[in-house]
From Swiss-Prot:
The family this protein is said to belong to: Belongs to the ABC transporter superfamily. Methionine importer (TC 3.A.1.24) family.
Binding of ATP, residues: G38, H39, S40, G41, A42, G43, K44, S45
Name assigned to this protein: Methionine import ATP-binding protein MetN 2
Listed GO MF terms: ABC-type D-methionine transporter activity; ATP binding; ATP hydrolysis activity
Annotated ranges, domain ABC transporter: 2-242
Keywords attached to this entry: Amino-acid transport, ATP-binding, Cell inner membrane, Cell membrane, Membrane, Nucleotide-binding, Translocase, Transport
Subcellular location: Cell inner membrane
SUPFAM superfamilies named among the record's database cross-references: ACT-like, P-loop containing nucleoside triphosphate hydrolases
Stored PANTHER family: AMINO ACID IMPORT ATP-BINDING PROTEIN, METHIONINE IMPORT ATP-BINDING PROTEIN METN
Cellular component, GO annotation: plasma membrane
Enzyme nomenclature, EC number: 7.4.2.11
A Pfam entry, by short name: ABC_tran
Species per Swiss-Prot/TrEMBL record: Pseudomonas syringae pv. tomato (strain ATCC BAA-871 / DC3000)
Membrane topology: Peripheral membrane protein
Length: 335
């Protein structure tokens, strides 16, 4: 478990104190995929780098598996960091070393494993990330996705308990991003590894994360289960991220609906309710008519969800709305 207790970070620039992270309390449970989302300058990289003490907090306490890592000396910090792997946006591979040598680097530097065991471990890792045939290649011979897979294999070399991902998919195309996220999900599931990732893309959060924290100007403005935050955003920053992911401008959408008659509502379905024939049932029971103005069906990690924007006319609207609520469908009246 990772815990932040009133942790904050301030940089001194040109004689001025610049806060990068305001006092923050945070908890990441073992085995979770925890996402931190924010625009540039939000403080997410600072928060991530505080976990493995690449940054030293200005105050507060960071506790990992019951150990106060803010109190560790140099030897203790070296031991702790062997339990934390990290992958980066731009891969950080050594161009003059082969794929196998890059993956072996953490084990070689640790100096406590025979070469034969290192080679066996590297072979296992390359097989896990699907690069067994690329062991003798150099980074320049690899695609971006393959480079990131090497980075993931290297991060797993010391069998860490925690994997930190610093914008790990930002430099990749959408198809490659999807394959890397699938690999991270498999690693989390099979190795029971705790993963903390930062990103500026809500789609990344939606695909792989269990919990999310939304950051703005060094403050966590909203956090919770991904489904709750994604489907029912409260803070303006979160709402902007959701709109960017939906590629929908709500102001433009309101203009489009200006001529539509009736009450306009947005329904959100989760799990099995996503595929249930609820609209037809409610229409028959209450006598309402409806027009579908917009809709989508997608998944949040392994959970299906659907959103429909409807124009409802006629019949007993109050009874229809009560029926939606009774079926555990979240309803938002837009007009």
């Amino acid at each position: 478990m990772i815990e932040f207790h009133n942790v904050h970070k301030t940089y001194r620039v040109a004689g001025k104190e610049i806060p990068a992270l305001h006092p923050t309390n945070l908890r990441v449970d073992d085995g979770q995929v925890f996402g931190i989302i924010g625009h540039s300058g939000a403080g997410k990289s600072t928060l991530l780098r505080l976990i493995n003490r690449l940054e030293t907090p200005s105050g507060g306490q960071i506790v990992v598996d019951g150990e106060d890592v803010t109190a560790l000396d140099a030897n203790g910090l070296r031991r702790f960091r062997q339990q934390v792997g990290m992958i980066f946006q731009h891969f950080n591979l050594l161009a003059s070393r082969t794929v196998a040598d890059n993956v072996a680097m953490p084990l070689t530097l640790a100096g406590d494993m025979p070469r034969k065991q290192i080679d066996q471990r590297v072979a296992e890792l390359l097989e896990r990330v699907g690069l067994s045939d690329h062991a003798k290649k150099y980074p320049a011979q690899l695609s971006g996705g393959q480079k990131q897979r090497v980075g993931i294999a290297r991060a797993l070399a010391t069998k860490p308990k925690i994997l930190l991902c610093d914008e790990a998919t930002s430099a990749l195309d959408p198809q490659t991003t999807a394959s890397v996220l699938q690999l991270l999900a498999e690693i989390n599931r099979e190795l029971k590894l705790t993963i903390v990732l930062i990103t500026h893309e809500m789609d990344v959060i939606r695909r792989v994360c269990d919990q999310v924290a939304v950051m703005d100007a060094g403050v966590i403005v909203e956090q919770g289960k991904v489904a709750d935050v994604f489907l029912h955003p409260q803070h303006s920053t979160t709402k902007r991220f959701v709109q960017e992911d939906d590629q929908v401008d709500e102001n433009e959408q309101r203009d489009d609906f200006a001529h539509v008659q009736g009450r306009i509502v947005r329904l959100t379905f989760q799990g099995d309710a996503t595929y249930a024939p609820l609209l037809g049932t409610v229409a028959r029971e209450t006598g309402v008519d409806y027009s579908i103005l917009a809709g989508r069906i997608d998944r949040i990690k392994d959970t299906p969800y659907g959103q429909l924007t409807l124009a409802i006319t006629g019949g007993d609207m109050d009874a229809a709305f009560a029926r939606f609520t009774a079926a555990d469908v979240h309803m938002e009246v837009l007009r």
